Amino acid sequence: MYLSVTRMHSVVLLLCCSLFAAAPAIADEAELKSQIDTLRSQLNLLAEQQKSLAAQAAKAESDTSIGGYGEISYNNYRNDSSRNQADLKRFVLFVGHRFNDQLSFNSELEWEHAVASAEDKGETEVEQMYLNYQFANEMNLKTGLFLMPFGFLNQSHEPPVFYGVERNEVETRIIPSTWREGGIGLSGSSEKGMAWEAGIVTGFDSAKLDDASSPLAGSHQELQLARAHDLAFYGALNYRGTPGLTVGGALFSGNSTQGNADYRADTGKPDFSGINGRITLWELHTRWQKNDLDLQALYAKGKVSDADKMDNVLLNFNNTSTTARPYLPSEFYGWLLQAAYTVWRQGDMSVTPFMRIETFNTQSVMPAGFGADPANADHVSTLGLSFKPHPQVVYKADLQRYRDNPDNDRFNLGLGYMF
């Protein structure tokens, strides 16, 4: 702690009074002058210490950063108004700290659907928490819970960053955004515009698959008491050497039965002993941004080895259990094309209409004897508009049409922010 300015003035006054009180007893004028010089030196030293401590406190404060984002949505269904809903979809806070020029900490805390309780559907979760060590100018080591480098949305999903009130179907159903795993990862870049990431992380747990409409959503473990018998590896590569252009892809692969850990812990669950159930997911993407034009394309595909063996286990399980489990697909895929153009700008404000078409099928190939649900495949068209009164604040509106499942047709409104 350092002395406040008021306290320092009090010290000065006290010392001066003491000096003047003692003056009659000081016979030698030279001695008096020496004491005054000593006092002046001490005061100067005290002032310098105060400045130094204040500077250190200011630096320490700037090393810690806080940010966040949030979004609210309204969905109005064309054929069934009873499904209409308004939702405080997400409230997120970022907290980061830089320990020194090489070592930093990053975290992301998220609240979904406003209220989290036993009776409500809201969730509270740690979306990211990791340490990053920069041991070379263009190379980093990441350890902890972090986002997988897949597609456009998974690492950059703040509302002002993407088009549309809802996140696109392909990067929700095929790529399970927001997808994070615990582990260790390396990343680097070159002066020619190449950027790469690779690492070893926790994998999927196929015993937790609970939704055939999004095969990987329930089975990625989020580092919540994650089974770690079967780890996975990932890699991503992106080229950004041409201004405005991004071309890249990513791969993730690992066994998913986790040594049959779920059955070993509870024999009331499916028994996948002797089955590996490797899940492999890959994607390719490209983006071109030039002046007011923004074009995007993405293709993603997943494969589950041993899906036939696992589904036969699930068939026997479902025949004897009161709780039916969905069957795993051998393959699933999705693709999207998107175009946006900013038609008006004034100061910080802008208006950008966009159009997106996408196709997905979460059960494109099923093992022999197991049928696919038509509700899990569709062609979706989205036409919408984003108005930004500030680059970090957005109001959105769009129309969505589902060709094969028209009951999902809807009109959406939304707002979002980031800081």
Residue ranges and their predicted role:
Residues 10-21:
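Bacterial N-terminal signal peptides
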Residues 1-8:
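N-terminal secretory signal peptides that target proteins for export/translocation
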Residues 49, 197-199, 207-212, 260-261:
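A short secondary-structure junction signal
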